């Protein structure tokens, strides 16, 4: 593999990794405050893709407006999921919440299967995203550089929120000790709902970017992507926002470059990502940026 092809694959890997990272942030933040793996999170990504397509293609809104409306709607939808499915089980066992999360996931997948059918739909987006730019012998699409850039900018914005605002301080406090937070008069449920809203909006954005890059959507599109995003969160150190982004980029890079090096194994590209995750966890079970000294996540 020559240098130009390798650089091309690096860009493609970073783009795919950025999509995983956006979804992984939601996994890691919800886990941080609830110690819950929200299996419905990846289906919110699917909802975001369908919502954007509907608002853009059927309603006729400008694409940017459709995306922003989708982010807001999915944020509210995430809060609704928390309010209806998870809040009544705050004091229940973790296995009860886990089963509920799986139930919400199955419900959303089957609901959209009934509403839109089980067949794949073409995701139409403005031509701008698929226009190419040449940098020497490296040719990349606009979406390939936009995704990593926006992912990094959003990471910086989230870190600012977590460490420079009182809402961020409250989020970190809930993640550390929710019972003490309640004794201090802070509405923990409100903070948890805020986390669900933020994570759901990011998942929706990840779904939009993924659908632009791989322009077919269906009600089950979130299953495999969600597993990879969860793997990215675990790889980076679940509970660490920076780790989730780092894990997403590493996973995307590994998946794309491995297939480029071994094209005959292209049918097993999904296995490369999980194999790499297993190898890392064998040597560092807490993930790359996880801290085994901390029982509670502090982001």
Where are the predicted features?
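Helix-loop-helix "hairpin" substructures at the membrane interface of multi-pass membrane proteins
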Residues: 16-17, 138-217, 241-247
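Inter-helical junctions in multi-pass inner-membrane proteins, predominant
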Residues: 2-19, 161-166, 192-233, 256-270
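Transmembrane helix-bundle core of multi-pass membrane transporters
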Residues: 88-164, 191-194, 215, 257-265, ...
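Short, non-helical or kinked segments that cap or interrupt transmembrane helices
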Residues: 18, 27-49, 63, 91-96, ...
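Alpha-helical transmembrane segments within multi-pass membrane transporters and channels
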Residues: 27, 60-104, 111, 246-251, ...
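Membrane-interfacial amphipathic/re-entrant helices at transmembrane-helix boundaries
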Residues: 1-23, 51, 63-66, 92-97, ...
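Short loop segments and helix-boundary regions at transmembrane helix junctions
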Residues: 33-37, 76-119, 161-168, 173, ...
